[in-house]
Amino acid sequence: MNVQAQIENYITGQPEPKRSDMQALHRITLRVSGECKLWFLDGKDSENKTVSNPNIGYGSRTIKYADGKTTEFYRIGISANTTGISVYILGIEDKKYLARSYEKKLGKASVSGYCIKFKKLKDIDIDVLEAAIQYGFEHEL
């Protein structure tokens, strides 16, 4: 199954209203990103054990480890979870930037160094979330 089909299955497998929110968020992220690499991670490790929630990734970045090894990973990710939806904005050097710049304007959301969590899209200002996603695509370590 290709990545597009995996993403579609993941989103349509969500209960409402999370399904509609994930579909809208997927469309927003695709619009902001333009043409980019899509990822789907099922949340399972090499032994097929669940280690995280499944997530959809957008874009590409290179992560360099202390030992000099590198790996490719996504820039923006979205994931449905038991408490709502998480948006991951990776590669921002200033770990306080997201909270400082967006938390007060977002509405009912919690913001960490790389994650924006909310229960439903209707609880937040979508334009502010879109601006944070745009920032994530434009700025990287």
Task: Provide a role label for each language-model segment.
Residues 1-141:
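Charge-dense, helix-prone N-terminal extensions
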